[in-house]
Amino acid sequence: MHAPHSVALAAGEALTDDERLHRARVFADELTRRRTVRDFADTPVPHAIIEHCLRAAGTAPSGANQQPWRFVAISDRAVKRRIREAAEAEEREFYSHRATDEWLRALQALGTDAEKPFLEIAPWLIAVFYERYGLDSAGNKHKRYYPHESVGIATGLLIASLHRAGLATLTHTPSPMGFLNDILEQPRNQMPYLLLVVGHPAPGCRVPDISRLPLEDYARFV
């Protein structure tokens, strides 16, 4: 097997196990305060904050290091309005015709409907795409390996980074989402993965009274 070109691993901080435990606990405790928000303020968020959070997302591992994620950060009011109008059209179809009764019952606890004002009110939308295949300069297609998994990891890092920066998020997945390619002029080899709504919670914001699974219900040690 051909030996890849390699470089020395950058030295990390020298930590004791107690220090590692403290960091792990603090990080987990901070993420337990993360909540999905649907009621946003229109308070501006500086471009640089979004940029650095996207930098963090871009550090995610990926299949064959192909890094198939593509992000479009949107603050333009007219573009956000177009996205809202297209998303609400799909959502009306979903709630009226596409969703099963079981699915609608599952959504009742969250209080969702076809109206999505947050798509205009929040200062930022981040459209997340994954590359189905790569294209070289000659237009030849190249397979992407594990694009869904890779982009899912990158999106998780993005959400965690935004939370760490003191911002609220909402993962929005209207189906289908092909309108994002049209509005944002993304090439057809890039498929919409989700739409992330980013900003500050509105004053008096309330969230559903739900709970998370305890650790023992979703993890075990062997």
Language-model regions, residue ranges each:
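Small-aliphatic-rich amphipathic alpha-helix that forms the alpha element of a beta-alpha
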Residues: 34, 55-57, 126, 132-183
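Glycine/small-residue-rich phosphate/adenosyl-binding loop
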Residues: 3, 67, 73-151
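N-terminal accessory segments that position/regulate proteins before the catalytic core
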Residues: 1-37, 41-52, 97
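C-terminal helix-cap and adjacent tail motif
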Residues: 1-23, 113, 191-222
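Glycine-rich phosphate/pyrophosphate-binding beta-alpha loops
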Residues: 58-65
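Short, electropositive alpha-helical surface patch
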Residues: 180-193
